[in-house]
Amino acid sequence: MNDLLRFSGAVRRDPDVDAWFDADDGLRAIARPWFEQMRGCGDDVRELMADGAPTACVGDAPFGYVNAFSAHVNVGFFYGAMLDDPAGLLEGAGKRMRHVKLRWGRPINDAALSELIAAAYRDIGVRLGEVARQGGPKTLL
């Protein structure tokens, strides 16, 4: 479990993330409260823009992101494949990453998505602790 993706340059509050949300794009407004939840997970949360998307990290290890597309918003999780998802919100087929798609006019299971965000934050904390116990990270980036 020590293969952790790492991003350098994460900071407490990244002005590039704020600029992304300030752009004139209605779908970004849908993404904002979910990223705010990620920001609020703990004092150790940092952020940066990664691949054009606001990304939340603990230290340099990402746990979540949001992104806006032409018809939907993704709320994504870097280790989402390992998260418990009793509401069945997560989509994707990759080895690790999963996302929840949000669309205009479709209901959102706020409680379940909030729990996924909290679970992703807790999960990255466990992963970071596991890395420390194993003598340091083997990074993927």
Question: Which residues fall in each region the model found?
Answer:
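Charge-dense, helix-prone N-terminal extensions
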Residues: M1-L141
